[in-house]
UniProtKB/Swiss-Prot annotation:
Family per record: Belongs to the neurotoxin 19 (CSTX) family. 04 (U1-Lctx) subfamily.
Propeptide: 21-41
Signal peptide (UniProt feature, chain positions): 1-20
UniProt comment concerning the protein's domains: The presence of a 'disulfide through disulfide knot' structurally defines this protein as a knottin.
Keyword Membrane belongs to the record: no
Compartment(s) where it occurs, according to its Swiss-Prot or TrEMBL record: Secreted
Species this protein is from: Lycosa singoriensis
Record-given protein name: U1-lycotoxin-Ls1j
Cellular component GO terms, alphabetical: extracellular region
GO molecular function: toxin activity
UniProt note on tissues of expression: Expressed by the venom gland.
Superkingdom of origin: Eukaryota
């Protein structure tokens, strides 16, 4: 009976050790993922900067992510080109205004 208890204790120890290494691997993967997200955040396009070549690369604002807004520009030669910039959508501006006003009133 004592041998069975020793074998069971040994198996429990081995299983817990192997699962803790698996958890460490998961934590390392999460850390790498967070570092990649931080790098992406540093490389995003700030508000009012051009996003013509990367329309999904705008940074986050206070509450919402900026959206790439495009307009058609006609040159003196008559050529039409598309120019885009990162900005806040009108309904997002309104929501930020209401939240800011609410914070001033309710503290």
């Amino acid at each position: 009976m004592m041998k069975v208890l020793v074998v069971v204790a040994l198996l429990v120890t081995l299983i817990s050790y192997s699962s803790s290494e698996g958890i460490d691997d998961l934590e390392a993967d999460e850390l790498l993922s967070l570092m990649a997200n931080e790098q992406t955040r540093k490389e995003c396009i700030p508000k009012h900067h051009e996003c013509t070549s990367n329309k999904h690369g705008c940074c986050r604002g206070n509450f919402f992510k900026y959206k790439c807004q495009c307009t058609t520009v006609v040159t003196q030669d008559g050529e039409q080109t598309e120019r885009c910039f990162c900005g806040t959508l009108p309904h997002h501006k309104a929501a930020e205004l209401v939240v800011g006003f609410g914070k001033k009133i309710f503290g």
